[in-house]
């Protein structure tokens, strides 16, 4: 049952008391939805803001208005439906619409995202400006493009396209965009929403055919993540230019030789690397041969890159591609560079790391973490998702390489192991003392990071996020009361519901999800 406004106000006061008492979980809740810049004293309104954001509203005034207009219970279910459509949580969509078939009534953005052509036509018949009016953070075209409802109702594709045509006829733009978040104005295009976010090739093709810009700085890069080449081919066909982008480097993350071939044929240059921070984040990729080294690219990929002109003499953060190949254990690349006579000498620290990578006996050797080059400081986090790296990781830990240090995004190896759905490594990091209270740079805890990975990790189908979640729960992590309802994976939702019932002592109000 949804809490009343008065109860939520009391929750805000309780959160403030806990925050001012420096309780870890209260601090995490505020950090997950920061109402003000760091170190700015917080007021009562700021804690109301956190309570509203945890309830999936943009602000306390937005929550209060929704409660006054239609009742808090219905408003809360509408917010949950919006999230479910955006994330593609089919079982949540089904339950909400089965329980309340008219839940989208009066919510134009929801009606667009649900491909309700009849309702949208009715609204536009009396209010043509509705087609271009921003609703929340998104215009109607972005509500349509970022909806993953097509995977829940694929037979509604014709209605989806008819709705897109209707919006366009009433003034909407195929080049509409939306900010990443309320506090981050980096823009994500409707085309990215359709192709990169929603994996909706039907709508992506329609947008491109009607003039969407294929060079939006996001779509081509993220099209390499989808596990197929339809998006990459579609974008290249409509003029996407891979030169100067990191799309080729991202395709290497997935060992996708075919995508790399397509991008090279379209003009991609293997020595291109754009280190510009996007939306406040550093790139997830690095120059091609260094990328090949740390991703353990195989012979076909290495030969393809070298044939296309990748420079073995290129350095990144002061380290050669050859050193990377040895340190990360990619002997295929190391041999290829040696064959070209371009193998520089390794530093003493690199020799120790290379020995650990090759399976050599590290004996009593230890690395002073303070002397570890920055390029290798996060090596455990960088390799843990790769097959067969468990023993390598243990040798690195034995050498003294930090196993619980956060990277630039605040992600620790434990968080990444949980996100990747790797229970053996999740358990290993917990057993050797990783910090269970750590909150990463995205505001996530270990539990919320596992839930996020269960819906977003590209390899989630063959991973085991449920076992990672059990490991975290058995270690005693706090469980937000709404976690079972927030989980997008029905298996994890049921697991959490059962755990909450059997372990009420771990249940907490609010918190990152």
Predicted regions and their residues:
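Ankyrin repeat domain, specifically the short helix-to-loop turn at the C-terminus of the second helix
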Residues: 94-102, 122-130, 162-174, 205-213, ...
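Leucine-rich solenoid repeat scaffolds
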Residues: 314-339, 447-450, 459-506
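Ankyrin-repeat intra-repeat helix-capping/turn positions
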Residues: 88, 115, 159, 198-199, ...
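Short coil/turn connectors between adjacent alpha-helices in alpha-solenoid helical repeat scaffolds
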Residues: 148-162, 195-200, 297-298, 382-389, ...
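Extended, hydrophobic interaction surfaces within ordered domains
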Residues: 38-66, 291-339
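Ankyrin-repeat boundary/"N-cap" motif
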Residues: 74-83, 103-112, 132-154, 177-195, ...
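Intrinsically disordered, low-complexity eukaryotic regions enriched in glycine, serine
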Residues: 1-100, 110-114, 119
